[in-house]
A protein has these predicted regions:
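N-terminal low-complexity, acidic/polar interaction/targeting segments
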Residues: 1-195
Length: 195
């Protein structure tokens, strides 16, 4: 993925933060968001998703959205009754949402990809071990006798991906998830997820 600014269709999300490397399903119902998905499908299947601060707003402004979002690749799209589309997406990279170029017929934004910052590998490893232990305990409480979720996350060697995957999986408030998405320091991000 390029590190220079780019223009992509954008979907404001209600109640969810999508992280890089996370695969999730999104049900899209807002007309402008459905149009953004169609525009992405007609081009290269990439779009930007970012969380709304207030879910009740129908047409959020730049200030009413998270300043950091995620470029996602649409892997699958299914049309549902009532004009809703369900998309299976995979997070690609964090982006700063620089400007909204248009809101009709769909949101289009200029975004700049953001790189994670490795400050102290030893500190990252320490937080990672703590997080591994806490996540294993959480999985045991939520889904006893299964290693599936644990293996998926623990299989990654990347501390940044660990923090993002676990922040997406464990129950956290939307504001906390958005703060984790906005944090570029991997050590601080791991610490935020550890709680």
């Amino acid at each position: 993925m390029e590190t220079k600014p780019m223009t992509l269709p954008m979907v404001p999300l209600r109640g969810i933060v999508v992280f890089p490397k996370v695969v999730t399903q999104l049900d899209i119902g807002r007309t402008t968001s459905v149009q953004a998905v169609k525009a992405a499908m007609d081009k290269d299947q990439y779009l930007v998703v970012t969380a709304q601060k207030d879910e009740s707003i129908e047409t959020p402004t730049l200030e009413e959205l998270g300043k950091v979002g995620t470029i996602v690749k649409i892997n699958q799209m299914l049309r549902l009754p009532g004009g809703v589309v369900s998309i299976l997406v995979e997070g690609v990279s964090r982006v700063n949402v620089d400007t909204i170029l248009s809101t009709e017929p769909f949101y289009e934004a200029t975004v700049t990809p953001l790189e994670s910052i490795h400050e102290d590998p030893m500190e990252e490893e320490a937080y990672r071990r703590i997080l591994q232990s806490k996540f294993a305990q959480w999985v045991e409480v939520i889904k006893p006798n299964t290693d599936e979720g644990l293996d998926h996350v623990l299989g990654s060697a990347d501390a940044s991906e660990w923090a993002d995957q676990i922040a997406f999986l464990v129950p956290l408030q939307l504001k906390v998830r958005q703060s984790i998405l906005e944090e570029l320091s991997i050590s601080r991000r791991l610490n935020m997820v550890v709680g």
